[in-house]
Amino acid sequence: MLTDNRKIFLIGPMGAGKSTIGRQLAQRLNLEFFDSDREIETCTGVNISWVFDVEGEVGFRNREEKIIDELTQKKSIVLATGGGSIKSHIARDHLAKRGLVIYLKTTIDKQLVRTKRDKRRPLLKSSTLFNYQNLRELLEDLAKERNPLYEEISDITVSTDEYSVKCVVNKILVLLKKNGAIYKD
């Protein structure tokens, strides 16, 4: 059971496992799970790719900022954020000040494997890739831009590369106990 900090926010690049790990972590801690991308889809009634196409990245990021503001005010949650949510200084501020931020870190090689066939990610659409030689180049640019922002607000960093989901969740639980964020069982 969490003590003072009953809010856990997962950040990191696409393909790091935020949604999958977040669901299991929430279940283990008996907390409610939210995914900011799914919440945007619920609010708009369309998928995030459509929002990206119609409103552009700026419109999408504005929606994302509002959703993160709302969700970070909830109690007893695990929140999986979109990979680009940290681009907004307002969203970063909400995440950093309102809960415990866990940076799920992964390599570009793992991102390539995990996102290869994913059609739901707006940044992986061919129109975005138009300016890049390949997906690796895009992911490298995103990493250069975003990794320092993930590191800036994270309380805990966990690599998801060589571990199963269960193993990563267990690792997070150990770190939460070590940091005094949850009672020892």
UniProtKB/Swiss-Prot annotation:
Main location: cytoplasm
Bilayer-crossing regions: none
The protein's Enzyme Commission number: 2.7.1.71
Uppermost EC category: transferase
Gene Ontology CC annotations of this record: cytosol
Positions that bind ATP: 15-20, 121
Annotated substrate binding sites: 37, 61, 83, 146
Record flagged with keyword ATP-binding: yes
HAMAP family: Shikimate_kinase
NCBIfam families: PRK05057.1
Binding partners and assembly: Monomer.
Protein's recorded name: Shikimate kinase
